[in-house]
Design a protein with these regions (language model features):
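Short Pro-Cys-Gly-centered "Cys-loop" motif that presents a nucleophilic cysteine in a tight turn
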Residues: 1-64, 78-289
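Short beta-strand->loop micro-motif that forms the acidic, two-metal-ion catalytic signature
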Residues: 70-79
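Conserved strand-loop elements at the edges of beta-sheets that form or border functional pockets
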Residues: 67
Length: 289
């Protein structure tokens, strides 16, 4: 077995807002406490109007979105170094609209937005599916395809006139857009029964969700010329999980590599210890092996 060496790949970073041209982000914003962002249909429509304006003004490429009653998701690429300016403009304009319309004062949003950097095609697929599954997992609809305020309809209806660049995501699956659409819908359906938790509650959850999700959709990427680090991680996880004491040198190398990869994705030693059913000291010892 060839354990990867010095191949630490950061595919998903929920902490610092690393900004560079061409970077792809999963943006999350929410209302404070139990407040809501959208009271009625016109609120959703106005936010989408603003998103279209901002997308054009700041040259963003918007891949998908989901507007939930108390929070929202946007998956997008920046083509200039203007992420903060664009998001500030979007959320400030909506906050002014919301407070004016409902004759209220105070914060509409709970602090600053979160920007999760996605730098791998497979994680981009996982993020988009996570976003589109939100309404289903929140019991707002019986089928994610039925939710009105997400971009999922574009992924199966394939509109020719839209501000969404949904084809970018679908082309990861196939250059044949109709075939890619069918594959994407199948992937969404496969994601429905998976354990699901809000990234708002646990900023590392999407990374954990992706590890399971990527293994589930392995067949969709067969034959594609993509990096295999994520599949390596899943394989090594299966190899060493629930093993307290390792004697086989290959198992020892696999555990060390797995821990290094998980650390590079933002997991803490405590998180990794929990995932591998080990003590924190065992994790430190494994890194020194």
């Amino acid at each position: 077995m060839n354990i990867g060496k010095d191949n630490i790949l950061r595919t998903y970073n929920p902490y610092k807002k690393i900004v560079y041209k061409g970077a792809i982000y999963h943006i999350i914003q929410r209302a404070p406490g139990k407040d809501i962002l959208f009271v009625e249909e016109n609120d959703y429509l106005y936010f989408l109007h603003l998103l279209k304006e901002i997308q054009k003004e700041f040259s963003f490429s918007v891949y998908c979105f989901c507007l939930m009653p108390n929070h929202l998701h946007i998956l997008m690429k920046i083509n200039e170094l203007n992420l903060s300016l664009g998001m500030k403009s979007l959320f400030t304009k909506y906050a002014i609209y919301f407070n004016t319309k409902y004759k209220r004062k105070g914060h509409v949003f709970y602090g600053n937005y979160r920007a999760f950097l996605c730098s791998d095609d497979r994680y981009l697929i996982a993020a988009s599916v996570y976003i589109h599954l939100n309404p289903y997992k929140a019991n707002l609809v019986n089928d994610p395809m039925d939710y009105k305020w997400s971009s999922i309809s574009a992924y199966y209806s394939l509109p020719t006139r839209t501000f969404l660049d949904y084809k970018y995501v679908l082309n990861i699956l196939s250059n044949n857009i109709k075939k890619a659409s069918l594959s994407y819908m199948d992937i969404v359906r496969q994601g429905k029964p998976l354990d699901f938790k809000s990234v708002i509650e646990d900023s590392r959850f999407l990374g954990k969700f992706s590890l399971v999700f990527l293994d589930k959709i392995r067949d969709f990427f067969s034959g594609q010329d993509k990096n295999t680090y994520d599949y390596d991680i899943q394989r090594y996880f299966e190899q060493v999980k629930n093993k307290k004491r390792l004697k086989d040198p290959e198992d020892i190398k696999a555990r060390k590599y797995l821990i290094e990869q998980l650390k590079s994705r933002g997991y803490t030693i405590k998180d990794i210890a929990s995932m591998l059913s080990l003590s924190r000291q065992s994790i430190y010892d494994a890194l020194e092996a």
